């Protein structure tokens, strides 16, 4: 009974901690607040590298909080302190290597997605960065886990018409991304890890006017990486604002030497082979993930970005 009582107290204290923070905070001038939410400890350090390259050279000072949420039923309350120490070890090591000061935050939750959105919305964050989990990952362990989950679904659940989002990685990622974007009052990035180290060769996909915000993020990224960028203009001549989009793209590549507008109009495995990072807007991702599934098996590490039209956060 003692572990049970401890667990109840832990959940209560955690809920109270979240409530304490839930006083709406206005974003501070000159500060770009990023909430980086990670699951596995090793992923935290990789996502920190992404955040540092994406935001550290922005016009506003980067203020990053690393959040690790554990589902309540998975935690032994008597080992919480040790669990927290192990979870943040790699990301704190990464921060030290980068010369970054970061905040760490550990919570036990029974509704991780909602708690993450509550923290973002009530504490004045400008950006939410989350990982895709094993979805679309190309690590051997994650591929094996995905195959097992898919075969398990096909064998036991398909005949009962259970939702594919329970088991299929593409559907899981789509649902996860949609939830964070729908509930967060800030820009959101969902990171897909494909052995990410540094964004030295970045592919940027533009298919509509609403994707042009990616150019601002690209400009900041290049200040940190000093890499190169290739831009794919996926729109057609019938795309609304086609001429204006092209003008802005040409202005962009004309002003930044290490960028180029590619002749490619489609995303292919051959194109992906030349890049180690991709920036793509949320709506464009939804279209590409539906119609170019095979090609995406060869995609590089990718950050799916959504610009929140309700906020004016700007780094």
What are the functions of these language-model segments?
Residues 22-103, 107, 111-127:
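Extended, intrinsically disordered cytoplasmic tails
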Residues 3-44, 132-315:
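Intrinsically disordered or low-complexity boundary/linker segments at protein termini
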